Amino acid sequence: MTLCKWWRFMSDLDALQSNILADIANASDEAALEAVRVMALGKKGSISALLATLGKMSPDERKTEGAKINLAKDTVTRALAARREVLKALALDARLASETIDVTPPLRETPAEAGRIHPLSQVWDEVTTIFADMGFAVAEGPDIETDDYNFTRLNFPEGHPAREMHDTFYFNPKDDGSRLLLRTHTSPVQVRTMLSQKPPIRVICPGRTYRSDSDQTHTPMFHQVEGLVIDKSSHLGHLKWILHEFCKAFFEVDNVNMRFRPSFFPFTEPSLEVDIQCRRDKHEIRFGEGEDWLEILGCGMVHPNVLKLCGIDPEVYQGFAWGMGIDRITMLKYGIADLRQLFEGDVRWLTHYGFRPLEIPTLAGGLSS
């Protein structure tokens, strides 16, 4: 091959490759890309035609020019494959855009289909809000506690009935002989608070508690809220005012008569149980009137031994505490007869006793219709 023919051949090959690559880049779909492939690499394609001319060349020319043509063929083949992947991705994006599925839940059109807030959740929020308005913080702790925090630091002596296996859920003893248990009250949270904070202290401690008991008014797991105030001047008058204001707000009455009876708890001295005045009308209880009394909580001044065991000097500080069952006051306020119904998960029951998310429950209209 003369120099002139070789130059023309190379110019034609470079121009051909550039044109083919431009056509590949401009192909807008698989069909257009396939047409370019046939035009370039098909049996009658332009590059195939160049390969056919190799037979007319000398062995040396065939070796040299054949390598150049094959290089151009490989370049075009790789460009075709790359463009094909791009077109596949574009096609997939277009299909996904046209087949978009709305995965958000459909709007419930009727109130009957709406979810309900469980009465216990509702009362938990009510209680927390009322005490928060009085300046109380919320303290929480673990459900699994040590015997030390659950009993010993709360002035329970060894051999106290509450420590017995038939009343408390114990875990197997640890290697050092200490025992873990499911807390029987939320008082261990008070212990943790006194050990970690310096007075003054003003907290409530809501949470789950556990005792080995099950009947119409008891379940193995139940909910409590306890309160604790520690400072230098707190006294029973402050405790009575707090409980009186809470009962007025929670039971939605302008006034409620309360009766404080002497009692005994290892962790308070003096200890008191609190009753509120009410009137029973068949299945309804009205608070703030009548001649009946209902026990709702226990309370008292924190025992000096508890303060000592929690690192607080009883010669400087004093305080009071109280505890009530969230399940019990839920039953009293909203007319629930059987405690076990709170935990059975009956959708029909929850539809009646539950609350819609945006409604404000009241004694008069608190229950869902």
UniProtKB/Swiss-Prot annotation:
<dbReference type="InterPro" id="IPR022911">
    <property type="entry name" value="Phe_tRNA_ligase_alpha1_bac"/>
</dbReference>
<dbReference type="GO" id="GO:0006432">
    <property type="term" value="P:phenylalanyl-tRNA aminoacylation"/>
</dbReference>
<keyword id="KW-0479">Metal-binding</keyword>
<dbReference type="GO" id="GO:0005737">
    <property type="term" value="C:cytoplasm"/>
</dbReference>
<dbReference type="GO" id="GO:0000049">
    <property type="term" value="F:tRNA binding"/>
</dbReference>
<keyword id="KW-0648">Protein biosynthesis</keyword>
<keyword id="KW-0067">ATP-binding</keyword>
<dbReference type="InterPro" id="IPR002319">
    <property type="entry name" value="Phenylalanyl-tRNA_Synthase"/>
</dbReference>
<dbReference type="GO" id="GO:0000287">
    <property type="term" value="F:magnesium ion binding"/>
</dbReference>
<dbReference type="InterPro" id="IPR010978">
    <property type="entry name" value="tRNA-bd_arm"/>
</dbReference>
<keyword id="KW-0460">Magnesium</keyword>
<comment type="similarity">
    <text>Belongs to the class-II aminoacyl-tRNA synthetase family. Phe-tRNA synthetase alpha subunit type 1 subfamily.</text>
</comment>
<dbReference type="InterPro" id="IPR045864">
    <property type="entry name" value="aa-tRNA-synth_II/BPL/LPL"/>
</dbReference>
<keyword id="KW-0436">Ligase</keyword>
<comment type="subunit">
    <text>Tetramer of two alpha and two beta subunits.</text>
</comment>
<dbReference type="GO" id="GO:0004826">
    <property type="term" value="F:phenylalanine-tRNA ligase activity"/>
</dbReference>
<dbReference type="InterPro" id="IPR004188">
    <property type="entry name" value="Phe-tRNA_ligase_II_N"/>
</dbReference>
<dbReference type="Pfam" id="PF02912">
    <property type="entry name" value="Phe_tRNA-synt_N"/>
</dbReference>
<keyword id="KW-0547">Nucleotide-binding</keyword>
<keyword id="KW-0963">Cytoplasm</keyword>
<keyword id="KW-0030">Aminoacyl-tRNA synthetase</keyword>
<feature type="binding site">
    <location>
        <position position="269"/>
    </location>
    <ligand>
        <name>Mg(2+)</name>
    </ligand>
</feature>
<dbReference type="GO" id="GO:0005524">
    <property type="term" value="F:ATP binding"/>
</dbReference>
<dbReference type="InterPro" id="IPR006195">
    <property type="entry name" value="aa-tRNA-synth_II"/>
</dbReference>
<protein>
    <recommendedName>
        <fullName>Phenylalanine--tRNA ligase alpha subunit</fullName>
        <ecNumber>6.1.1.20</ecNumber>
    </recommendedName>
</protein>
<dbReference type="Pfam" id="PF01409">
    <property type="entry name" value="tRNA-synt_2d"/>
</dbReference>
<dbReference type="InterPro" id="IPR004529">
    <property type="entry name" value="Phe-tRNA-synth_IIc_asu"/>
</dbReference>
